[in-house]
Amino acid sequence: MKDWERVLGLDLAGSPKRKTGYAFLKDKRLVVGTLYTDEEILEISKGFKLIMIDAPLSLPEGRRSIEERGPHFRECDRLLKKSGYRFFPISLGPMRMLTERGMRLASILRSKGLEVLETFPGAMYDLLGIDRRDKNAILSLYKSLPFELEDRPYSQDELDAVACWLAGVCYLMGKVLTFSGKDGKIVVATGECFSSPPLDKE
């Protein structure tokens, strides 16, 4: 479980004017909150080894930049879609900013020797049969896990950040679905992960 304290989950916003959720484990307690700027994100990332980000971290093969015309979907996106999971393509308005920011931050973090992976909370919720916007159901899942979580209202950004963190934990446990292609990889926590020790709270 000590390794889990080296995982940081980020529900990245496309703009530094909007909230980015973060989540990590410290002394068996989930620390959850929001921040805004790239500088704040890079600062909080210090001391972690695995960063899980809810944002596209690569471009489709054949697309040279987010501004130029090109393919809308990566191979990993097509695999995700084939499995029945809904998502927004990187070419959609707000997703352009998110993709650009995600790629930039991932590049900086990787240059510092950190492992950075893309994840998608929406797919995790779908796998577990939870409505993506049902905060009460999502929070109920988190409270069933063997970690302390402050009893307070949580924003969707914060809840999704916890989902990102959990994807990192499940990745370390080897219990994830990996949608991998030549132009990107998306890691999603599986239901099996939540029914396996030590996540299966007794």
Which residues make up each language-model segment?
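Phosphate- and other anionic-substrate recognition elements at nucleic-acid/protein interfaces
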Residues: 1-202
